[in-house]
Amino acid sequence: MPVLATPRLIALMENAALQAAAPALDEGMTTVGGEISVKHLAPSPVGATIEAHALLVSVEGRKLTFDLSAQQLQPADDHGGKLVGEGTHVRFIVHRQKFLDKL
């Protein structure tokens, strides 16, 4: 069916969390996903504009917890629109090279 697939919605929401965390990280550091829980609430046609948001709600050492949401923007909307997904996501701060060396 020509609709937004749940894995694509999750990828958009995870990327929003990645981008939200990035400005606060020291050089050489990044985050990796550890857990995600998403509800796909409404269908969206292929080609619709989807805006994903991540709000950092908790920091426990290296563990970052985000509330996630995604909206389908309506034509001429600047923000908001139909809520198509929501959830939570946990990311962990890691040293990029040390993490890659373990692969």
Model-assigned labels for residue ranges:
Residues 1-27, 98-103:
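Hot-dog-fold acyl-thioester-processing enzymes
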Residues 2, 39, 88-92:
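Generic structural detector for well-ordered beta-strands
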Residues 12-16, 53, 86:
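Residues within well-formed alpha-helices
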